[in-house]
């Protein structure tokens, strides 16, 4: 989603740019594992859109510039990763990196933490599952009110939200 301004310039609106729904082709043994992979795959899937938004503001990037942004940071847009899995939020925001019980997830955890340190992810946010609009795209039991709000340009969180903004290297 992208934050913008209404045509009259009086209110902030949200634009849904892309929505992806797919299954993992990996065997997952825990909900933590499924949520961590969803976060990592979501970032991976969103990266081309993020780069496109950056290019719309700064002009077309040369391959060396794109590589430099990935290695050192420097996006002109602010990216917030939102999850409703508190265990994922805690493992990504902890001071010390701890190896997950499912050791195969360590690469995913390390990759997301690296993106946060470089500033490619400005903030990590945890929200209550009841406020998670992405769940409405895939689960039939989720209230459609949030989806309808997003389609009209509004995104509101009715429950407390935790936000972590890491310091850039």
What is the role of each PLM region?
Residues 4-37:
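A short, polar/acidic, helix/strand-boundary loop motif
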Residues 1-4, 104-105:
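Gly/Ser/Thr-rich active-site loops/lids in small-molecule metabolic enzymes
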């Amino acid at each position: 989603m992208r934050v913008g301004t209404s045509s009259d310039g009086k209110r902030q609106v949200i634009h849904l740019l892309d929505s992806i729904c797919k299954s993992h082709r990996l065997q997952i043994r825990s909900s933590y594992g499924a949520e961590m992979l969803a976060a990592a795959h979501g970032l991976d899937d969103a990266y081309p859109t993020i780069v496109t938004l950056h290019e719309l503001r700064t002009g077309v990037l040369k391959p060396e510039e794109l590589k430099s942004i990935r290695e050192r940071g420097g996006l002109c847009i602010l990216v917030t990763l939102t999850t409703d899995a508190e265990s994922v939020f805690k493992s990504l925001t902890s001071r010390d990196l701890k190896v997950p019980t499912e050791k195969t997830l360590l690469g995913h955890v390390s990759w997301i933490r690296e993106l946060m340190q470089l500033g490619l992810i400005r903030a990590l946010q945890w929200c209550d599952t009841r406020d998670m609009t992405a769940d409405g795209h895939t689960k039939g039991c989720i209230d459609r009110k949030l989806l309808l709000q997003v389609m009209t340009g509004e995104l509101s969180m009715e429950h407390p939200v935790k936000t972590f903004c890491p310091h850039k290297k």
